[in-house]
């Protein structure tokens, strides 16, 4: 058991070393794509889980818009991914109106408003 703990500690130290060596913009871009994937998962549900997709899309937008010019080579890709997932959200929202939006209330956030 002690050997397993030592091996796990060594592995954690190696992961920390690799993360510390990577540019922060690369690590953040990876996490932003995780938000994209999370939104896509919620949008692909039947029916789409629009409230949960909104959270992921809003998180993605918050990071991309706040760090303009600081996301390195991944920035154009992240902006395009954000635009695509927002477009998918709008299309699915129109095809699957929630009871609240049918009553005149619209969901805020993920559509870019």
List each language-model region with its residue ranges:
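A charge-rich, low-complexity, intrinsically flexible signal that marks solvent-exposed coils, linkers
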Residues: 1-113
């Amino acid at each position: 058991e002690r050997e397993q703990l030592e091996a796990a500690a060594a592995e954690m130290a190696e992961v920390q070393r690799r993360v510390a060596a990577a540019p922060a913009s690369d690590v953040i871009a990876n996490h932003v794509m995780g938000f994209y994937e999370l939104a896509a998962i919620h949008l692909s549900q039947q029916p789409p889980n629009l409230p949960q997709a909104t959270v992921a899309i809003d998180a993605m937008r918050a990071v991309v818009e706040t760090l303009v010019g600081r996301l390195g080579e991944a920035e154009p890709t992240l902006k395009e991914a954000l635009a695509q997932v927002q477009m998918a959200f709008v299309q699915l929202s129109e095809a699957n109106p929630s009871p609240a939006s049918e009553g005149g209330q619209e969901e805020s956030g993920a559509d870019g408003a």
